[in-house]
């Protein structure tokens, strides 16, 4: 299985793991724990205290408490894979809680997905300096 990392997923609305009666229906990998039906901020804090994850995955960050929990996770040595609704770097940098993170370069990559008229998805990747990386 290659690199073995402890991964935890906070799946507030069962949109990532699609858990049913506590069992993930999507393949989350052999070393992944899923916290289902728990708020993002609370879930991240519980996982940091009890599971010592190397990576925490969470979707749709938006509330101030989410950003505080991400900052705690980063300060505790976990990496965070998170999603945020934004169409481009300008829109992303205008989000209230992200501005200071972007200034501190807490993120290594920013990936923007765009659906084209033919149904295909176009991807744009930026580095921590907010410079576009060609894929």
Predicted regions and their residues:
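Conserved P-loop NTPase
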Residues: 108-135
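Structural signal for conserved beta-strand scaffold positions within catalytic alpha/beta enzyme cores
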Residues: 9, 33-36, 82, 112, ...
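Short, low-complexity, polar/charged sequence segments that are solvent-exposed and flexible
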Residues: 26-29, 100-102, 129-133
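P-loop NTPase switch/communication element
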Residues: 1-47
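Conserved P-loop NTPase nucleotide-binding/switch module
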Residues: 51-111, 115
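Switch/connector loops and helix/strand junctions flanking conserved nucleotide-binding motifs
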Residues: 16-19, 90-92, 119-122
């Amino acid at each position: 299985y290659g690199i073995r990392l402890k991964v935890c997923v906070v799946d507030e609305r069962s949109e990532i793991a699609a858990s049913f009666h506590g069992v993930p229906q999507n393949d989350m990998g052999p070393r992944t724990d899923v916290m289902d039906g728990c708020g993002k901020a609370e879930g991240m804090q519980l996982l940091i205290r009890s599971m010592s994850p190397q990576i925490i995955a969470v979707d749709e960050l938006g509330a101030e408490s989410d950003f505080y929990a991400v900052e705690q996770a980063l300060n505790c040595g976990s990496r965070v894979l998170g999603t945020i609704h934004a169409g481009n770097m300008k829109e992303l940098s205008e989000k209230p809680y992200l501005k200071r993170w972007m200034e501190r370069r807490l993120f290594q990559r920013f990936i923007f997905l765009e659906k084209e008229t033919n149904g295909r998805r176009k991807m744009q990747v930026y580095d921590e300096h907010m410079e576009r990386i060609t894929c």
